[in-house]
């Protein structure tokens, strides 16, 4: 593997915003897709996360492809749905963007933990990240299912060996967190500005 498993993500981040600083739909979704192979390396522990992320990318992408000019900018989905009064629906693009962003919050926090806590086991790093990000938005059933799955997290050393490739994995993880985190912050900021950042799982 040329570079690390993060190399495509780091490259994709350069194209996510327009020259005016607006979040572009297609590059953002493509960036999220580059993270799916990273999730694959976790095996069964991340099956739920991968399925959730993949489903939300597909939902947003389908709507984007219905009118690429109209939905060139990521937040247009939300603005259109708010006007149509469907933004709070469980199958809305607004809901999809919110949960996609939250799942990515979890992954960023997980990789922050792996960088900052060299002595933590993988299940410990996963559990801490879940507590800090997704847990408060999940109901009891989702929380129990998620916590059970995270116990299947792979051995940390084996995982690091698999994702390292020929690059500097510590440096790439740090860059991933530092550069991807602000995009997620922007999403939350926008969603909060229209009252859509605090929806819980049903």
Swiss-Prot record:
InterPro entries documented for this protein: GLTP_sf (IPR036497), Glycolipid_transfer_prot_dom (IPR014830)
Pfam families per UniProt: GLTP
Cross-referenced SUPFAM superfamilies: Glycolipid transfer protein, GLTP
Keyword terms, alphabetized: Lipid transport, Transport
Parts forming coiled coils: none
Annotated positions binding a ganglioside GM3 (d18:1(4E)): 52, 56, 99, 138
GO molecular function, one term: lipid transfer activity
Record GO cellular component, one term: plasma membrane
The protein's role, per its UniProt record: May be involved in glycolipids transfer.
Family note: Belongs to the GLTP family.
Protein name in UniProt: Glycolipid transfer protein 1
Organism: Arabidopsis thaliana
């Amino acid at each position: 593997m040329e570079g690390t498993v993060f190399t495509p993500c780091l490259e994709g981040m350069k194209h996510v915003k327009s020259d005016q600083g607006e979040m572009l739909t297609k590059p953002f979704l493509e960036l999220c897709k580059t993270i799916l192979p990273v999730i694959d390396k976790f095996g069964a522990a991340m099956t739920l996360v991968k399925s959730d992320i993949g489903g939300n990318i597909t939902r947003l992408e389908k709507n984007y492809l219905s009118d690429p000019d109209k939905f060139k900018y990521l937040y247009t989905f939300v603005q259109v749905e708010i006007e149509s009064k469907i933004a709070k629906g469980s199958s809305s693009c607004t809901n999809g963007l919110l949960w996609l962003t939250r799942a990515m919050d979890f992954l960023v926090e997980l990789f922050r933990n792996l960088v900052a806590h060299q002595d933590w086991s993988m299940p410990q790093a996963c559990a801490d990240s879940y507590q800090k990000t997704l847990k408060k938005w999940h109901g009891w059933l989702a929380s129990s299912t998620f916590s059970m799955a995270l116990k299947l997290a792979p051995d940390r050393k084996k995982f690091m060996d698999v994702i390292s490739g020929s690059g500097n994995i510590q440096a790439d993880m740090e860059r991933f967190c530092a550069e991807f985190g602000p995009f997620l912050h922007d999403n939350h900021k926008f969603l909060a500005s229209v009252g859509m950042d605090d929806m819980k799982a049903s």
